[in-house]
Amino acid sequence: MSTLLRQHAEQQFAEELHELKQNETNPVPENWEMSPQSVVTYLMGGKLKNGFEVSPKYIGNRRLMEIAVATLVTDRALLLYGLPGTAKSWVSEHIAAAISGDSTLIVQGTAGTGEEAIRYGWNYARLLAEGPSVGALVQTPVMKAMQEGKIGRIEELTRIGSDVQDTLITILSEKTLPIPELNTEVQAIRGFNIIATANNRDKGVNDLSSALKRRFNTVILPLPDSIDEEIDIVRRRVESFEKVMQLPAEKPALEEIRRVVTIFRELRQGATADGKTKLKTPSGTLSTAEAISVVNNGLAMAGYFGDGEIHAEDLVSGILGAVVKDPVQDK
């Protein structure tokens, strides 16, 4: 078993990716690892012709994944948009792993992200000693993706300042990255594209300019439609977490997962499941990702401070922490 706390998607699911490539029967775009159809099978799960079972990475509307993958065959970039905790980063990572075999070409967007994180930077010691040169140039993940024909990822695009966001316009429209200091440019090769993620809930985000919006095809990832779908997502992710962390606790009973998911869904909707009682909606999103965290925390509590079997009391503190984000508003 790997000692890594978290493997990249292409490492964790290497066997599945290998089997999909070995059983490929559809046309594969240049510099892609597999066909768009196989990428969707990798995301949604399924049984291959040789009987091999591919586990689902995304549980939800298959059509959304088909639209997302089809976008990346075109000249438009992909923007995964939605509430926090709707698997935007998870989907982005797995699409990049399936298409390029590399999900690590990533820029994490923050309020402090500058142009040099997207375009290129400089090794200032060499820049002062040699002046502008190829040796002094520091490549960014986006530049590497262009040169290698891979998928580049930008997380939390709307957290980046609007002026910095717009440095992507030339990259996405003309598929070139000018380097005027060296009187040259980097031209993207086939297979290159960008997957960006953004959420529509957090405060302090910067809206995309209309010019940049036109360069993206936006796919909105919703919260799970049904309670059974959400329970299945939580169960699968918790089982995966338990294997990695090797917690001294039994797998949580499905009923405990159902209890957490039901509480979260009722609070999100502002009413009990039967619709008879109205509830105050908290300030937090109470997403599926937070439900997973609550159950994981409950497992740790049960394993180290309980009898090894998860009970309601092991989940209470996690639920309280997820619900009460603002002590005043959520009182």
Predicted regions and their residues:
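A short structural micro-motif
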Residues: 91, 266, 321-325
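Conserved AAA+ ATPase small/helical "lid" subdomain
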Residues: 231, 238-310, 314
